Structures are given as C-alpha cells and as structure tokens.
Amino acid sequence: MNPSAENSARVVATQEGDSPRQLTAPLTFFFAAAVGVIVMNLFAAQPLTAAIGRSLHLAPGLAGLVAMLAQLGYAAGLVLLVPLCDLLENRRLIVQTLTGCAGFLAIAMFADSRGVFLVAVFLAGATSSVIQMLVPMAASMAAESHRGRAVGNVMSGLMLGILLSRPTASVIAGAIGWRAFYGVAAAIDALLAVVLYVNLPVRRPLVVTRYPALLRSLWTLLRTEPVLQRNAASAALVMGAFSAFWTAIGLRLAQPPFSFDMNRIALFALAGAAGAIVTPLAGRAGDRGAGRKALIAGHLTMLIALAAIGAAGADWGGFSTGAHPALAVALLVAGAAALDAGVVTDQTLGRRAINLMNPAARGRLNGLFVGVFFVGGALGAMFSGAAWSLAGWSGVCAVGFVFTSVAFGLRLIGVVRGTEV
C-alpha cells in the first residue's frame, strides 16, 4: 500500500482476531449462503414493483423508485458503513448492521405509508452492505495460500443470490403476496445475525483515527492504489456487460419466437445461474499462480458467449432464430451461463488481489472495489435500455461487447506491462 494512503487514516496496526478461528468448510458454506441471502434484498424488488405500486398507490414513476432506492441505499452503505470495518470491532459491527437490516425489512413489510416504505427500503439497502463486511472477514480467517479459494467460495454464494433473487421473490410474492417476501427476508436476516454472533471471531482493528478521516482516506486509496484501480475498473466493465444482458433478456424472451411468460423467464434465470459454479475454481487458480491465464480465459469466454447470445437472439452470423427456436433457447442458456462464468472469474480474482493488500484498510478497499463495479453495473443497465430502444437485441449485445472488449484490452495491457498477477 502507498504510504500516503496509509497515512491518510493513520493506521497503526490491525489485530486479525482476539479469538482466532480458521475458515472451515462448513463455515465457508455458511458465509456463502449468508451473502447470497442478504444480496436478495437489493434485487428482489425488481419483479415486485408493479404489485407494490398497486398496493401502496404509488404513481408509476415512484413505483420504479422501489428497486432503485434499495441499490442507492447499498451504495450509501458501501461509503458510510463498510469503512467502519477498519475502525470498529468487526463481529459486533456485522451483527448490529444485519440486525438493523432485519428491522428495516420488517418495517417495509408492515408499512402502509408510501414514505415509510420507501425510507425503509433505502435503509434496508444501506444495511445490506454488511455483505462487504462479511467477505473481508472470511478472507481474514483464511490462510493466505487459500485466500483466493475462500473468497471464490463466498463469491459463488453472492452471484447465485443475485441471479436467484428475482425468481425467488416472484415465487414468494405469487404464492402469498409481496409483503411476505419482506417478512421472510427479515426473519432470515435476524436468524443469520444470531448465527454469525455465535460463529464469528472477535476482530478488533487497532487504529488511531476518527471516522471523518477514515472517509477522507477513501479518495486517497482510490487515487493512489494501482492494484485497486486495475481490478475495480475491470470488474466495473464486466459487470456492465452482465447488467446489460440481464436487464434486457426478459424483454427478448417475451417476444416471438420465444413468447416466454414470467415463470419461464424465471426458469431461464435459474439455468443461467449455473455459471456461478466456476467461482471457487477461479479462486484456486489465483492461489496457484494461474490468475493471469484465468482472467484472459474468462474475458475470452465472455466474448464468445456474447457472440452466441447475439446469434440466438438477433440472428447474427446467418443463424435463424425463427427456424430453430429450441436451439436458440439452448444457445441463450449456454451463453448466459458462460457470460456469468466470465464475470465471476474476473470479480473473484479481483477480490483476491484486493484482500491480499494491507489488512488495515481491507474494509475500505472492499467497499471501494464493490462501489466502482456497482457503478459499472448501473451504466450497463442504462446503456442496455437505450440500446434496446434503438436497435433491439443486437444493440444490447453490442453494449456487452464494448464493455467486455475494453476490460479484455485493459487486462492484456497489464500482461504486457507485467502488472497482472
């Protein structure tokens, strides 16, 4: 870490844990399941906006805020809450943040007022940033030689949670109403808080600083840390491609010749989630010194996947979707899984690099990394919507190609310069 970055928060030392505990296989699985469940708070509202809007008498414009507010809250939590990992005892911080999240979800479930509901959704999103406290906690509990594998295993839960959040919310809301989803989420988060309190070690960062100085150090870290810059930029670009695809795929599947209803689109999302299985493999590749090759392979896989997706949805390369609809669906499923695999490879290896940096700034580094790729995802969704309106599915695939090609180019430049691990 650059001295200026370290001095900006006047970090003296970091005590990894007063009660050392190794990251066992069952505990790794629990971490993965926990982040997978919590991340659903951010994306599950998207298929529920219409039902919520009708129930709370929200205008169409305000109904769209439901999904956006959760993610805006998450972004605020990354900046304001996650850096506290470098200042406060981590177990207590994680448990209290997750307990708060459960409380805000419960308020959202019972809210009859539009204002109360929207504020509760925002605060639930902010406290869902506890995910980015759990990932560095898991990394700190793993031996350095296995840190990539540990991060990869936890990230697999995160990616599965993102992909499964929409169909899960649709199923729960369809069976017992949208309020039930928030109730179930609140109960699960409260239970997770209890289990985490029992299983997490005490970890006290020993710092001499104040909260405002800690926040000011975020900009210094982002400006001076090349490892953070490279990995966050690449993660943002591939997340942009990922978001562009998943933002528009439901629109394409609803069109002929597919004409999928909501249930079939949910099943498609489940099938596409298969790409997350490569996450622990990517982490192991990084631990074995093959991270550079895995990154290049991941980006090439994404480019090939986008070509297949373009052929299946927009008749690229002379393929006829109308003449071969079943084959087109198979190509879309395979392409979605391959695209997801490339994204999680990049993010897992990026996470590994971030968590091998100075432990005293691990919370801030993780918060910045996620914040930057979160911006990439938002840009991908925005460009996807515009591309769909202007050029249909071909435009969406072109957006994915541009994002992925730039990420691939940046990684190749890093290989040539010898800066890639």
Where do the model's predicted regions map?
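Cytoplasmic helix-loop-helix junction between adjacent transmembrane helices
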Residues: 121-157
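Conserved MFS/SLC helix-loop-helix module at the cytosolic interface between two early adjacent transmembrane helices
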Residues: 76-114
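Structural signature of the two symmetry-related core transmembrane helices
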Residues: 93-106, 186, 293-308, 401
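Juxtamembrane intracellular "pre-TM" segments in multi-pass secondary transporters
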Residues: 12-22, 200-232
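Intracellular juxtamembrane helix-capping segments at the cytosolic ends
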Residues: 130-142, 344-358
